[in-house]
Each structure stands twice: as C-alpha cells, then as structure tokens.
C-alpha cells in the first residue's frame, strides 16, 4: 500500500489553557483534492500553521513524503514540496507580476539538491504559469494594478512557482463573485489534474462541494468528520456544528 503524501498523527496544540488542536489524525494521498472546513475558531488555521511550520505542535507528528517534518522551519518545508497560498495575498509590491513568480523559482526550486533553472528556464516557466492562471497580459504590471480576483490568481501562481507536491489554498475565494469563484475552482482543479495534491480551506460551501473529493471537518480543535462530500454534509454532527441545522 502506498504511503500517504501527508500523514498527521495525534497532533496537539495549546495556547496557554486553550486547546486549539486535540489529537488530530489525517492522511492525504498523493493526487487528492481535500476540503478542510469548520466554523471560525475550529482549528483550521492552527492545523495548517503546524503543517507548514509557522507553529510548532506540542504533541503528535507531521510526516510529508515519507519524512518527518519535526524541527524543520517553514522555508525548509517549502523546499521539500509544501506550498501555501494566503487569503490576503502577500506579493512583493515593488516587483512586477512576472517578477513575483521568479522569486520562488530562484530561492525555492533552485535550492533543491540537483536542481538548477537557468534564466531562460525561469522565463519560460513564468510565461507558462501566467498563461495557466490567465495573467499573461499582466506580466509587466505591478500588483497594485491588479483586480481582487487577479491578486488571488497571482497568489496561487506564486505558490505554484515553487513547484510543490502539496498546495494548501487558504480562503482563495473569499469576497469574490460567483463567476470569479467558479474561475478559481476551475484553476485549482486544473492544478490538481497536473499532479498537485491540494487541501482547500474555504467557507464558500458551493466551492468546497464542487472542488473536493473528500471533506474533513474540524470543530473546537477536533476532527468530527472525514469522508466524501455527499456523506459528510448529511452527518448530523456536522449539520449541528457547522451548517447550523
């Protein structure tokens, strides 16, 4: 049996007396599309921060691609193939759109053993990524010139520029119109079809349902459901805790 790409066992995190994560177990297979949902304060962001190395868990383990991530800093985890996009995009404001994509290629991809992208390679990959997300006509623009949905696309493209095995997309659609949400969902599915495993954190249920092959639900730091979307949304505990029914 193939080992999971991401394997979390007994993960626990406290902030003083507050239990943010309580014994979380989660396995994500290579190529999966997983939706991570739950009410505000349920532990989603804390879990992602522990996976990515922004926070240190007090108990349990995180393994990625067969390797323990214990003791690795966030940038070291990125070098191993973990990438994250943020709800509030964080581009380099003084760099062009294309320049923002070059940074992870130079400092992340080229930092991996045995990898060296030439300037021509980087230019070609930038152009390909910009076409993929529909920003090829914005390559020389600064981030301040972009619309809200274009900023979200740039944020996703920056994450992809690091050539991850796993992308964690955090609230990539908040505040967008329905048409823009559909556009982002289509992009994420396209990324997945190109071989990237994706965990999507999102409150827009129609987006989560159309994207996810599997749903994981957190409430009060505990995993209360994990399964296919059609089964999870009918779980009485999920309805009470998350959907308010």
Model-identified regions with their sequence ranges:
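Glycine-rich phosphate-binding loops of nucleotide-dependent enzymes
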Residues: 2-245
């Amino acid at each position: 049996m193939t080992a999971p790409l991401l394997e979390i066992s007994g993960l626990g995190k406290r902030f003083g007396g507050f239990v943010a994560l309580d014994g979380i177990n989660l396995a994500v297979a290579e190529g999966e599309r997983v939706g991570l949902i739950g009410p505000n304060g349920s532990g989603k962001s804390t879990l992602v921060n522990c996976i990515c190395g922004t926070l240190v868990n007090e108990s349990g383990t995180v393994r990625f691609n067969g390797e323990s991530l214990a003791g690795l800093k966030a940038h070291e985890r990125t070098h191993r193939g973990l990438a994250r996009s943020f709800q509030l995009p964080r581009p380099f404001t003084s760099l062009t759109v294309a320049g923002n994509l070059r940074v992870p290629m130079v400092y992340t991809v080229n930092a991996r053993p045995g990898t060296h992208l030439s300037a021509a390679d980087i230019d070609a990959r930038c152009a390909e990524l910009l076409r993929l997300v529909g920003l090829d006509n914005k390559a020389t623009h600064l981030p301040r010139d972009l619309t809200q949905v274009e900023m979200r696309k740039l944020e996703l493209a920056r994450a992809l520029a690091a050539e991850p095995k796993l992308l964690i997309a955090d609230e990539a659609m908040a505040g967008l119109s329905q048409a823009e949400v559909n556009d982002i969902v289509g992009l994420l599915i396209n990324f997945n079809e190109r071989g990237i495993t994706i965990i999507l954190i999102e409150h827009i249920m129609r987006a989560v349902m159309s994207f996810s092959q599997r749903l994981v639900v957190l409430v009060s730091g505990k995993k209360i459901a994990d399964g296919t979307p059609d089964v999870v949304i009918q779980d009485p505990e999920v309805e009470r805790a998350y959907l308010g029914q």
